[in-house]
């Protein structure tokens, strides 16, 4: 079996990353993983983790190989360390050993405590050649949600809002519809982000004034769990969040029995409520959270340094007065993405 070059290893690992991204909306709370099997410089099998509870990437890649006799002289590339424990599926490291694949190239080590190097060691103990760290940062970035959830014990948090050219997110109002700052096309991107999240959060004022459904409509995908803060349970019973169509968590100070698809969680709003909320979401295995507003809620996440990325749509129109946009710290770097003649500023915090 010929040694692969650094360029070849990175080429195949990039393919692993491409494959893994196909599982974005379906694998949580598992990580996205892709795998490629190469023999004599040619890809003979590939796969990715499609859905939580189903076969892992390595299994799907091995199943895709038409001539299994080639496995004995192949290299399997995988973006994340193969698992070594029994979960909902058998250990992938055991399957790789069973199929006598002699060489394994891994993007990054698994941060999950039940794996965390054990898969790598099991492969090496079985006499396999194992290389770790090919495109490591890219592979870690791929599973930022999984890493955050398993190391910080909270969801990966994405903040999102649209603001006018003069930095307002809405007019001052006590009723009526909000000012629409997003274009129909950038609104599709918002629904894409919703489909990619496990849960979506708004505060009481946004739920009251906007009466949002917080569902995915302009994109294909599942509806995220709705998370609403309503300290005194003052929201009207006919609000869309109470329609029972989507699992909904209401954080409040008052005791309230569960209704259809609606769970009330009691917390102390006078003692670090965001910390209590994150603990509750972690216990429910919610790996990613999209925070859509309003201003006070978004700013509280920023002030508590409780966020991982933020998407800010910059709109060309001016409002001249109204509700000021949240303020980001100037110390954080950002990239500017152009979407449909709009700028979207993307802030990312380091792992």
Question: Where are the model-predicted features located?
Answer:
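Enzymes that bind and transform nitrogen-containing heteroaromatic metabolites
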Residues: 2-31, 46, 66, 70, ...
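Helix-turn-helix
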Residues: 34
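Zn2+-dependent cytidine deaminase-like catalytic core
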Residues: 37-138, 225
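N-terminal pre-triad scaffold of radical SAM enzymes
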Residues: 74-84, 152-163
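Short secondary-structure capping/turn micro-motifs that flank functional sites
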Residues: 112-113, 138-140, 209, 297-298
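Short Asp/Glu-rich motifs
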Residues: 115-116, 141-143, 300, 320
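Hydrophobic, well-ordered secondary-structure segments
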Residues: 120, 136, 140-143, 187-194
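Flexible, polar/acidic helix-loop-strand segments at domain edges
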Residues: 143-153
């Amino acid at each position: 079996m010929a040694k692969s070059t650094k360029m070849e290893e990175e080429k195949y690992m990039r393919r692993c990353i491409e494959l893994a991204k196909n599982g974005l909306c379906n694998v949580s709370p598992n990580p996205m993983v892709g795998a490629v099997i190469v023999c004599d410089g040619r890809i003979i099998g590939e796969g990715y983790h499609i859905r939580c509870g189903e076969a892992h990437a390595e299994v799907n890649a091995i199943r895709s190989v038409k001539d299994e006799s080639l496995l004995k002289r192949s290299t399997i590339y995988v973006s994340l360390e193969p698992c070594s424990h029994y979960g909902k599926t058998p250990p992938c490291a055991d399957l790789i050993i069973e199929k006598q694949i002699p060489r394994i190239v891994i993007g990054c080590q698994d941060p999950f405590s039940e794996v965390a190097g054990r898969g790598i060691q099991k492969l090496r103990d079985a006499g396999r050649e194992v290389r770790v760290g090919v495109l490591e940062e890219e592979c870690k970035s791929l599973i930022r949600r999984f890493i955050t959830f398993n190391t910080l014990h909270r969801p990966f948090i994405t903040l999102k809002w649209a603001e006018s050219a003069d930095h307002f997110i809405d007019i001052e109002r006590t009723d009526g519809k909000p000012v629409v700052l997003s274009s129909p096309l950038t609104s599709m991107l918002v629904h894409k982000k919703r489909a990619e999240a496990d849960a979506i959060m708004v505060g009481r004022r946004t739920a009251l004034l906007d009466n949002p459904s917080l569902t995915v409509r302009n994109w294909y995908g599942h509806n995220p769990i709705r998370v609403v803060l309503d300290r005194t349970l003052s929201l009207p019973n006919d609000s869309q969040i109470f329609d029972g169509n989507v699992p909904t968590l209401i954080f409040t100070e008052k005791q309230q029995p569960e209704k259809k698809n609606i769970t009330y969680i009691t917390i102390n709003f006078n003692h670090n409520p965001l910390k209590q909320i994150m603990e509750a979401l972690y216990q429910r295995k919610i790996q990613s959270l999209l925070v859509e507003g309003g201003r006070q809620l978004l700013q509280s996440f920023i002030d508590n340094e409780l966020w991982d990325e933020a998407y800010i749509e910059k709109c060309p129109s001016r409002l001249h007065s109204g509700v000021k946009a949240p303020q980001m710290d100037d110390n954080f770097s950002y990239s500017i993405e152009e979407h449909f003649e709009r700028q979207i500023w993307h802030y990312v915090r380091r792992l």
